[in-house]
């Protein structure tokens, strides 16, 4: 692996993740912004972000880079980028917790946070704590001879189902509450797909990579 290939691929992957994350934020969560502001709602990429859209964008960006822009073996390069992701995601979600971007339902749970409207779940905190566990798994597997794609599979299979459940804790009684489509948030539909992808990939990447391969 060349450092330049990893670095450049990560830049394209992250950049596309931010762009598509914003597009999904507008189209899936706030379509009225498109009606009110037209194309500017899309171009203001700093004005809102969907993490699920970010995952979609990251896949698009990595495939575009390693399959089209600079053809390289896809899975080992994408997996190398993915290895660092949960460690960064912990800090991202701690930022969400600090800003209280994802206030949940009223609760007397011991980790609930006190707000003017009462004690509530804070999904940024919960997700940061869960992702710390995922990062710990990645660290434990860091020197094992895993097959390319294993870390992509591991993250998808461990993150997505828990995120699906956590979204049921999001508030629906405050202004700015997440939109629901047939009772589920847009992210929950994405997590169903990500879970399936993760499980399928795990069945293909589980086990130790053969030295002869």
Annotate each language-model stretch with its function.
Residues 1-213:
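A feature for loop-to-transmembrane-helix boundaries and adjacent hydrophobic helices
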């Amino acid at each position: 692996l060349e450092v330049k290939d990893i670095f450049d691929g990560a830049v394209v992957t992250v950049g596309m993740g931010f762009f598509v994350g914003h597009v999904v934020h507008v189209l899936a969560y706030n379509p009225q912004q498109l009606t009110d502001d037209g194309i500017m709602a899309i171009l203001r990429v700093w004005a809102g972000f969907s993490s699920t859209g970010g995952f979609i964008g990251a896949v698009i960006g990595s495939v575009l880079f390693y399959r089209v822009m600079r053809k390289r073996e896809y899975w080992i390069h994408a997996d190398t980028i993915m290895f660092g992701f949960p460690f960064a995601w912990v800090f991202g979600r701690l930022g969400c917790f600090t800003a209280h971007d994802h206030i949940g339902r009223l609760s007397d749970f011991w980790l609930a946070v006190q707000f003017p409207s009462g004690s509530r779940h804070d999904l940024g905190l919960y997700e940061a704590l869960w992702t710390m566990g995922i990062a710990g798994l990645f660290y434990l597997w860091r020197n094992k001879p895993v097959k390319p794609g294993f870390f992509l599979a591991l993250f998808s299979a461990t993150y997505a189902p828990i995120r699906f459940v956590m979204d049921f804790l999001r508030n629906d009684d405050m202004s700015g509450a997440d939109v629901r489509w047939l009772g589920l948030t847009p992210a929950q539909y994405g997590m169903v797909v990500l879970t399936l992808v993760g499980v399928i990939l795990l069945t293909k990447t589980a086990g130790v990579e053969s030295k002869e391969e």
